[in-house]
Amino acid sequence: MRKGGLTPDRDRQIEEHELQETGISPDIERLKRNINATPYQREEEEEDREEQEESVEGIFESREVPSWKKQLTIRAFVVSFALSILFSFIVMKLNLTTGIIPSLNVSAGLLGFFFVKTWTKMLHKSGLLKQPFTRQENTVIQTCVVASSGIAFSGGFGTYLFAMSHRIADQSGDVARGVKDPSLGWMIAFLFVVSFLGLFSVVPLRKIMIIDFKLPYPSGTATAHLINSFHTPQGAKLAKKQVRVLGKFFSFSFFWGFFQWFFTAGENCGFNSFPTFGLRAYQYKFYFDFSATYVGVGMICPYIINISLLLGGILSWGLMWPLIETRKGDWFPSNVDSSSMNGLQAYKVFIAVATILGDGLYNFCKVLIRTFSGLISQIRGKAGSRSSLAHKEDPPASPASPLTPRISYDDQRRTRFFLKDQIPSWFAVGGYVVISAVSTAILPHMFSQLRWYYIIVIYIFAPILAFCNAYGAGLTDWSLASTYGKLAIFTIGAWAGSDHGGLLAGLAACGVMMNIVSTASDLTQDFKTGYLTLSSPRAMFVSQVIGTAMGCLVSPCVFWLFYKAFDDLGLPNSEYPAPFATVYRSMAKLGVEGVSSLPRDCLMLCYVFFGVAILINLIKDCLGNRWGRFVPLPMAMAIPFFLGPYFAIDMCVGSFILFVWERLDAPKAEAFATAVASGLICGDGIWTLPSSVLAIAGVKPPICMKFLSAATNHRVDKFLQGSS
């Protein structure tokens, strides 16, 4: 007898064989049954036939599912470590340039499949292959890589952690309120202390989230379908073609970055300072900077995000900032530096902050309402079904009854394997308590402003917020980790107060909260992927833990490389301005200081944009999907407010390329667009490693390509002729 029972196809074959043995034609018997059947039974049989054709697990039924220990292979973690370094560089670069980070799940799954498939093929030819490459192992790699590179975001290297530094404090003009400059030792220790709690907080709820509530987790589901498709014969062929395309554009992007480097010998030199629309437009950051990374990001991000970014850039740098600049000497002092928080920079930062907070608050409330209404519906539904069974005097409904929900073969098999390897609740609760105790003891020594009782309060509420974030992400595919972090900034910062280091306490609390809720939603997303690929929950948990540990080591080292290689890291007009670091410090400053330090009419404009962000979201939801998808996103519109629209132009170029490609050849665009985009992002992202090494070694580019107006060029020529 085979394991796992009979597949629908096998059941049908046995039934037809038995009918033939009795001399009855299966087709005639099926026709008789169809005539005598009720409409509902005919519908059931039709659904059964469709299920037999569409069953995913039916395809893999003959393949043995490895035990959870065999899913965790050495080769999987070697490949994961290599890919985590690659993706950490990519995420770090995006984090320190614009803060816009697209989903890299597809790239991680595709590259993981390619590397291990190549490895196993070589071993197979040499006769040393002991274990074939399975979709479960592919899922382990995907989970580990995403967990590791996720630390590059939740670790705060472009937000709360870098916001503590002297470099960002100088721009905000509040050095006296406390600084803590980056150091490799304390950053690694901090991440190890705070990054694992979220994993333990949601482990006991995995069955409720995945099986009982059947939350969709769109990203996790899409990743699982991708991995399942890789391991079918047709999917493997397509994956090879996709990897080939990715490799071509990776090479192009890498060598394009290398070529551009030769022309960047000075400030504002090179192709990334090309005045595409003229020098006047360039002054207000309207130009195409030839960034392969953001062209690729534009191909991945939805059209509405790219359009929203461009609209935000036009509204701010094309209209608002030139108008406010004319009020110099009236609304703010005329003698302040352009980067001073007492001048125009304050309007750029705080209006963006107000818009982000308005958008975040609206979506926070919306997701919470959906979360609690969904929970109430689930609880009522279960209570109703139990009471109806308890009081029902009639015999149970037949399998054909519409009262009994049908469970597909795929769901039966997936549920059986998902519940097979349990993670004990005592282990999860005990782990949370132990790590909380260690963290509460260590963190006050790292941040003297962060008192032990602040940390205990955070850890009491964190599991509730982690559950809310994980449930909300399951419904909407939207993690609100940064919003919960901002909530911690304001609450802990205000509690500590300005005179007791509230600014640093708020930023540190943000890091604690953000890491907990972010890893919690990531793990439940991975549980969904594991459920759909028959990967063991234990394997998913161990992979997430190992990936998180990798991230706690790799991400600080990558950031440290950037920090040491680029002296202007974090400055407004540099290659890596780290815009959200300024935003987070400004939020912390607001939390402890209030709004009294803002320039004239800045507060009024903040109120207006806060309200407009909520109103736009309300209009978007009221219009529904048909028309609401054309309404811009306030969060995306706010990012260019202090950064400029140049990267939005890059992303719109990516959108335009994708749009034209879809019109010319939609099937190929659907199959290869993500591979092209991933190649562009990965190649340019990995170029930052050699460029950082060259900068640390003191190797300078040989040429400065700079653009001047005719009048300035004439003066320069005259000066050079005079000096000669």
UniProtKB/Swiss-Prot annotation:
InterPro entries, per database record: OPT, YSL-like
Transmembrane intervals: 72-92, 96-116, 144-164, 184-204, 245-265, 304-324, 349-369, 423-443, 455-475, 478-497, 501-520, 541-561, 603-623, 641-661, 679-699
Recorded topology in the membrane: Multi-pass membrane protein
Positions carrying Phosphoserine: S25
Domain of life: Eukaryota
Gene Ontology CC terms, in alphabetical order: membrane
Protein's name according to its UniProt entry: Probable metal-nicotianamine transporter YSL8
UniProt gene name: YSL8
